[in-house]
Amino acid sequence: MFDRYLKSVVEGDYLNSEEAYLTARMLLHEDIPEIKAAAFLSALRTRKESQEELTGFVQALYEEAKMVDCGMEVLDTCGTGGDGLGTFNISTASALVVASCGVAVAKHGNRAVTGKVGSADVLEALGVEVQLEPDEARQLLDKAGITFLFAPHYHPILKQVGGLRRGLGIATIFNFMGPLLNPCRPSYQVLGISDSNLQEAVAGTLQRLGRKRALVVHAFNGMDEISPEGKTRVFDVGEHGLEVFDIDPEELGIGGFSLDAIQGGDATASARLVIKVLQGEPGPYRDTVILNTAAALLTAGRAKNIQEGMQMAAEAIDAGKSMETLQKMISFSRDRILAC
């Protein structure tokens, strides 16, 4: 059966969600020759994955995942990564500010894949324990208003295709479906994507997964975040249907600097940058975090518009609430270690 699906994809045909689901199951559980599996994933990437295919793969992976009962509506800021622009870890800093504004956050993430650091690397450098069991993750959420869900821990089945993905050395459907697999099944999400051709498909998949509202963002400069330099295209999806609009930072009073001004570094350097933002240091890093936080607050219904969200984010940072949220996250996550 796999050969039939491989032939279809190579010839440019699309799989429906059931066929994609079955293919994912075969890749994860059957002894598919690596050359055929690589050919399938490469062909899928070449002609771009569809909403049906993403949905089928996500359904297969969710069946294998360790799920978390968060007990409340949560928001996630996990993106695909892979834009190659070297900016600091914006989504992690934004997640902390969002939580300090009173929105519960379940941050799904991983270590670095294509860049220098991932969200797990940065949080560890900040002193947060990232490898938490489901009940521990729930307790951290209850106590700090934010938790972290380390993707490999909740999706161990992906080890089955780890060698294949490393050998290919290119982004595959597994990269783009990662942010769709939060084991808390969040109600709200801001998802940055590195491939603009997949924005609509990912937005549609999020809608099928039951998100109340999600923003799928890709900047015109290639950034997989809301960019402070130039416009960002937004696919806004949820119970209201689908809307597409652009965010222009200049109209919001942000800009005048290039992406060179928000570069990251290794995990330690990135952690220092996050702390500077949370401590209220003015400049491009702060402006970028405030802009992305505002979009998350809009998504979760906490802010009526981006402008109001920016004001709320700035006030939370300046009042010390965002730094306090990080300190709680560090303390309560480390309490788990001391209790072991």
UniProtKB/Swiss-Prot annotation:
Names of required cofactors: Mg(2+)
Chain sites annotated for binding Mg(2+) 1: S91, E225
Residues holding Mg(2+) 2: D224, E225
Family matches, as HAMAP family: TrpD
Subunit architecture: Homodimer.
PANTHER family reported for this sequence: ANTHRANILATE PHOSPHORIBOSYLTRANSFERASE
The species this protein was found in: Syntrophomonas wolfei subsp. wolfei (strain DSM 2245B / Goettingen)
UniProt name for this protein: Anthranilate phosphoribosyltransferase
One Pfam family recorded for the sequence: Glycos_transf_3
Residues reported in the UniProt entry to bind anthranilate 2: R165
GO molecular function annotations of the record: anthranilate phosphoribosyltransferase activity; magnesium ion binding
Keyword Cell division: no
Cofactor note: Binds 2 magnesium ions per monomer.
Gene behind this protein: trpD
Top-level class of the enzyme under EC nomenclature: transferase
Any one Gene Ontology cellular component term annotated for this protein: cytosol
Enzyme nomenclature, EC number: 2.4.2.18
Reaction equations catalysed: N-(5-phospho-beta-D-ribosyl)anthranilate + diphosphate = 5-phospho-alpha-D-ribose 1-diphosphate + anthranilate
Pathway connected to this protein: Amino-acid biosynthesis; L-tryptophan biosynthesis; L-tryptophan from chorismate: step 2/5
Binding sites annotated in the UniProt record for 5-phospho-alpha-D-ribose 1-diphosphate: 79, 82-83, 87, 89-92, 107-115, 119
Family: Belongs to the anthranilate phosphoribosyltransferase family.
Positions that bind anthranilate 1: G79, N110
Matches recorded under InterPro entries: Anthranilate_Pribosyl_Tfrase, Glycosyl_Trfase_fam3, Glycosyl_Trfase_fam3_N_dom, Glycosyl_Trfase_fam3_N_dom_sf, Nuc_phospho_transferase
UniProt keywords, alphabetically: Amino-acid biosynthesis, Aromatic amino acid biosynthesis, Glycosyltransferase, Magnesium, Metal-binding, Transferase, Tryptophan biosynthesis
GO process terms (BP): L-tryptophan biosynthetic process
Biological role stated in the UniProt entry: Catalyzes the transfer of the phosphoribosyl group of 5-phosphorylribose-1-pyrophosphate (PRPP) to anthranilate to yield N-(5'-phosphoribosyl)-anthranilate (PRA).
